[in-house]
UniProtKB/Swiss-Prot annotation:
Binding site for heme b: H194
Designated name of the protein: Peroxidase 4
Amino acids binding Ca(2+) 1: D68, V71, G73, D75, S77
SUPFAM superfamilies in the record: Heme-dependent peroxidases
Purpose: Removal of H(2)O(2), oxidation of toxic reductants, biosynthesis and degradation of lignin, suberization, auxin catabolism, response to environmental stresses such as wounding, pathogen attack and oxidative stress. These functions might be dependent on each isozyme/isoform in each plant tissue.
Source organism phylogeny: Eukaryota, Viridiplantae, Streptophyta, Embryophyta, Tracheophyta
Family: Belongs to the peroxidase family. Classical plant (class III) peroxidase subfamily.
Cross-referenced Gene3D superfamilies: 1.10.520.10, Peroxidase, domain 2
Listed PANTHER family: PEROXIDASE 67-RELATED, PEROXIDASE 72-RELATED
GO biological-process terms attached to the record: hydrogen peroxide catabolic process; response to oxidative stress
UniProt cross-references to Pfam families, sorted A to Z: peroxidase
Catalyzed reactions per annotation: 2 a phenolic donor + H2O2 = 2 a phenolic radical donor + 2 H2O
Amino acid sequence: MASSSFSIVVVALGVLALFAGSSSAQLSTNFYSKTCPKVFDTVKSGVQSAVSKERRMGASLLRLFFHDCFVNGCDASVLLDDTSSFTGEQTAVPNKNSIRGLNVIDNIKSQVESVCPGVVSCADIIAIAARDSVVILGGPDWDVKLGRRDSKTASLSGANNNIPPPTSSLSNLISKFQAQGLSTRDMVALSGAHTIGQARCTSFRARIYNETNIDSSFAKTRQASCPSASGSGDNNLAPLDLQTPTTFDNYYYKNLINQKGLLHSDQVLYNGGSTDSTVKTYVNNPKTFTSDFVAGMIKMGDITPLTGSEGEIRKSCGKVN
């Protein structure tokens, strides 16, 4: 009797697990193998062209994927433009005057449409472009799971609430990532995306003038192009990784150990807290960092995708069909 009850419970749990993972389970690395076999080459060509013109664009495309996935899943909602009757996510605090690369995705979408019209989603193009950006800048490669569809809606409040700001505490970072099904280790690994790219003065001003857990010479260097007065030089840029700002490597973590994290939300990863040991691991074992980063990217790409008959395949990424 006990064993049969146990069997029923096991089967029930199995069914629950099947339903819980059904969306991401419908994603596959060969989703377009028959319907659009040239999708990878087409996207890569577009990314290479954009990054060759401006290496920072690689970081911007990677960040675009993160900002998309953290708001109702990886559904290209971040690309939807505001209209007189529709408010998208682009004016949210984490995105306004900040997200970049939308025009690059639009251009790539046009190229993909010319090869196989109405087949590949904008959401999948963002995912592939993020991977290609990492590879082009010297980072790891991985097989991108595909089959996402594009949303017909967006969430301004979701963008404002779900994406952690640069002032985040460690506990806030952990909770924001946990809310998306990502572990603390995933969070530390994915924060390594800050090995490339730049940040605006307004996002690190408080750190370089008010915080004590910062290398003094580093702070002075940053202060030279980021005045203390709010409203002055707000959009002046500084590299997130002072050492190798356009190369994907583990210097981001080395900087943290030397108290040279640019953002408050960077340095909290190495400030006497629970994530210090992971930062040290990534400093001493770059291969562990890259493998964890890849695992985190795949996991992030699995966040509540629209699949099957859900959503749509947009003809133009900035608007619903």
